[in-house]
Regions:
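Structural preference for solvent-exposed beta-strand-turn elements
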Residues: 1-175
């Protein structure tokens, strides 16, 4: 919660869509050139707007943070991928291991944490960047220790881990 300032943010449509998604969730998002100021103090919704998130692949990336903050989330299945259809199975398997229960109805993924998030050991069949990111963002709010085996090790994973650490998370061996 609070304000985050991101620099060197590219001027691309997915950033604009994600900014609108965050605003609809209750965040204040201000763009000044290549800088984004995001304040999430007033985020009060865990349901993403279908008409926006169904247009972009990155929509699944809000799942872990919303679950971590609210214990539940309703997110439209991802769309808008120029590469083609890609599965989100590893996201779901990893989050289920943390204690998330899922239901899919009419293209909307409903997630709940009946017993809260709990640390666990997860093995990813493939080192998916997106699944690793979602697991990290949810796991930092879980009770206990989480180990992600076969996690992605790209620079963006290291950057995310460093960012979460700067906000108080305890993460080791990222990347």
């Amino acid at each position: 919660q609070g304000e985050t300032i991101l620099h060197n943010v590219p001027l691309i449509s997915d950033i604009e869509l994600m900014s609108e998604v965050l605003a609809r969730l209750g965040a204040t998002v201000v763009r000044e050139g290549h800088t984004l100021r995001i304040n999430t103090a007033d985020v009060d919704s865990c349901e993403t707007p279908y008409e926006l998130v169904s247009k972009m692949r990155a929509s699944i990336s809000v799942l872990g943070p919303l679950i971590g903050r609210f214990g539940e989330a309703r997110v439209a299945m991802p769309g808008g991928c120029q590469i083609g259809a890609r599965k989100i199975d590893m996201h779901l398997v990893g989050l289920e291991a943390l204690g998330v229960a899922f239901d899919v109805d009419h293209g909307v993924l409903a997630a709940t944490t009946p017993n809260g998030l709990r640390g666990t050991h997860v093995y990813l069949e493939f080192p998916s960047v997106g699944a690793t990111e979602n697991m990290l963002m949810a796991a930092v709010t879980a009770e206990g220790h989480t180990a992600i085996e076969n996690a992605a090790c790209e620079p963006e994973i290291v950057d995310l881990a460093d960012f979460l650490i700067s906000m108080g998370a305890r993460i080791e061996n990222a990347g």
